[in-house]
Amino acid sequence: MSKRPVKQERKEPETTGHSWDGIEEYNNPLPRWWLWVFYATIIWSVGYTIAYPAWPLVSSATQGILGQRAAGDTRLDVARDIALFEEANTEIRSQLVETPLTEIAADPALVDYAQNAGAAVFRTWCAQCHGAGAAGVQAAGYPNLLDDAWLWGGTIEDIHLTIAHGIRNEEDPDARWSQMPAFGRDQLLTDDEIAQVVQYVRLISDQEHDETLAAAGEEVYLMQCAACHMDDGTGDPFQGAPNLTDAIWLYGGDVETLTETVYNSRFGVMPSWQERLSEAEIRAVSVYVHGLGGGVESAETMQ
């Protein structure tokens, strides 16, 4: 097979001389100027990577012989901005830490700073569970922080303690702790007794219920549940025992969900934040959560 270009008839394009099953290739090389431009871009790109920051390394990048910082170097920019922010807010952050929790509300400037800083902390660390709007996720047992139904108390001191130490967090000895028995799994109650007490809970929470089962469930409730949830079902924030008489449920108030709760118990865990957040950040987010709408006034504030 010939390797030499073949001249075709007049006005027909030249081919390379190659043929594959009768198919020939036109001999149409790129223009010289295009090739020289292509070569020039290669040379320019190599020169650019030598002159300016370009090649990534393990913990940084080549800086370039011209010593210029890449535009928009986010690591340096962020570090600088954080340093400037910390410097600008040093005084008010110190004031936030030094002011007693119950007296923060009396300082409008301090409240304004705490609300804004707390909102940023909440979006970064808390919204993953409690939702961006703080309404919680009932299916997963993440509490709604917008209402006034608090498991462990809703004063600013209560909220601060909960955030700082967490709930049922084994890593922090000062974490809030409570344990609901698994009445069915541990065979503390029979299936019939569980069905009865579930109907009684629906009775005291003003939901549709079976009157016969609810009447029998009252005795079961007083024997097994009232020690934590109180005789009237209003709960005990000191133990983290929820109020069973309102329409606010951590996991749900339907028969199926209540049966699951009584049978297998619940064991929600909240991490301790005192090792991850500064005291100023914990106080700021405490003020923010307290001000979402359900915060309870502390006894000291009311005096």
Regions inferred by a protein language model and the residue ranges of each:
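Sequence/structural segment immediately N-terminal to covalent heme-attachment motifs in c-type
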Residues: L110-G136, D147, G153-T155, H160-L161, ...
